[in-house]
């Protein structure tokens, strides 16, 4: 398995990761996504308290190369956003699985996480694309 794909996270086909943290799920973009985007210059975040829907856009990430939509891996309520990205959006590039997280969602059904890909499935997706 690739070193840059943490085994303790879940993944989406849109190259986002999800980490269960208590009753909520922290979401960010993968190493692959940030490398494809290039230097991130802006991240549009949803409002805390807003509802996000699985597979639907919840934000935008802009880089020197492209503007890409961010899609929610789960349906639920946004309980926290990474306000630090307003001043330092490049944190998505330098620490995508840590300080570069994007939102924290309280899922309406915690079992939704089980439907996401594990690291092995995500690695296979990357190898086949």
Curated annotation (Swiss-Prot):
InterPro entries hit by this protein: 2-oxoA_DH_lipoyl-BS (IPR003016), Biotin_lipoyl (IPR000089), GCV_H (IPR002930), GCV_H/Fam206 (IPR033753), GCV_H_sub (IPR017453), Single_hybrid_motif (IPR011053)
Record key words, sorted: Lipoyl
Cofactor: (R)-lipoate
N6-lipoyllysine: residues bearing it: 65
Cited Gene3D superfamilies: 2.40.50.100
Assigned protein family: Belongs to the GcvH family.
Protein name: Glycine cleavage system H protein
Organism: Myxococcus xanthus (strain DK1622)
Gene: gcvH
């Amino acid at each position: 398995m690739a070193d840059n794909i943490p085994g303790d996270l879940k993944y989406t086909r849109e190259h986002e990761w999800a980490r269960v943290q208590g009753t909520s799920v922290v979401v960010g973009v993968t190493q692959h996504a940030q490398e494809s985007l290039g230097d991130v210059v802006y991240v549009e975040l949803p409002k805390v308290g807003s509802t996000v829907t699985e597979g639907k856009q919840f934000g935008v990430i802009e880089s020197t190369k492209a503007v890409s939509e961010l899609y929610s891996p789960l349906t639920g309520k946004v309980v926290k956003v990474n306000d630090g990205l307003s001043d330092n959006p490049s944190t998505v590039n330098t620490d995508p699985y840590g300080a570069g997280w994007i939102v924290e969602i309280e899922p309406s059904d915690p079992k939704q996480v089980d439907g996401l890909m594990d690291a092995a499935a995500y690695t296979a997706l990357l190898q086949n694309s």
